Amino acid sequence: TRRSSDLPCKAVEDLTTYPSILGGRVKTLHPKVFGGILCRRGLEQDMQQIEKYEIPEIDLVIVDLYPFEATVASGAEEPAIIEKIDIGGISLIRAAAKNYNDVVIIASQAQYQPFRDMLMEHGATTTIEERRWFAKEAFGVSSHYDSAIFNYFDGEEGSAFRCSANSQKTLRYGENPHQKGYFYGNLDAMFDQIHGKEISYNNLLDINAAVDLIDEFKDTTFAILKHNNACGLASRPTVLEAWNDALAGDPVSAFGGVLITNAVIDKAAAEEINKIFFEVIIAPDYDVDALEILGQKKNRIILVRKPAALPKKQFRSLLNGVLVQDRDLKVETPEELKTVTTKAPTAQEIEDMLFANKIVKNSKSNAIVLAKGKQLLASGVGQTSRVDALKQAIEKAK
């Protein structure tokens, strides 16, 4: 901190001659602070006023806001969350950004390095273009912060759509090479990428589908996806058995797919997985030997999935707006099923149907899934006719 460094430091209380009050809720909200930030150096009337009231000019403002989102994510009670709504910090950011003609604003730790680079390049002087860039970044921080607070209070009401992401990832391209692609969000909160090339737009679509699918299963399960649909899936006592039976469902379509499991991948499983070409593999962890085997191909994307909760809402852009719905977390149980045929299914058949239902729920309609013994045998997906989907599934099962 500055106080522990050799740099001269003055407490806010010394500047304002007023103590921090209300348990720290009011510290910087004072004319001697905001006057020094907002005064226009080129306006004689402003300069006369700050001289009259002995307000020092403030040329650089650095703010680290209270961690509101992190506090919400921690599951804290509302009183603790409320205390993490920053008042003075946001006000400092907005004031300094508004007066970017004369003031540099550093509104988050992400801007420390650009600011340091600027200082190393040409010292303590800044250009209007540089100050305007920092102001833009600052308003991005403040708008994101306010959106997070609104979304917390709005809860499940959905009274308005507010979506904000501080981190932007430029992708190699969009769905096709001629399209630009970006990802807004924090992938690092969900995955550690420990090997491989940069994740693409299409990779992200498959990864999203894979996560939604694997979360349906509690037993040790392995799934293989292509174009957002499962082409292989099995639940077995071990990850090796789950992999072998998932691959057996459609070994042709598995080529170049995205692989996901909810179990730790060991050496035995890695040796078998390594025999095919795939784009991405996702697991909660890997044995050291397994990583050494899977990392032999430099472009393979190897992800460790973190225990991060998925949003409760799903969004889809279309026309000139956005569709929002609750994430489908419904899980059917045998007790909810109604027999409408003369012949009633056996307990094993009901188990197979509920297993298949988890897969078809995460397949592109119209879709038919054939499964038995906790294994995907074949599927017909993305058909305009359910009859055609069934024909496709039967043909693939032969």
Where would I find each of the regions flagged by the language model?
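Short beta->alpha connector loops at strand-helix junctions that form conserved
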Residues: 11-18, 107, 283-285, 304-306
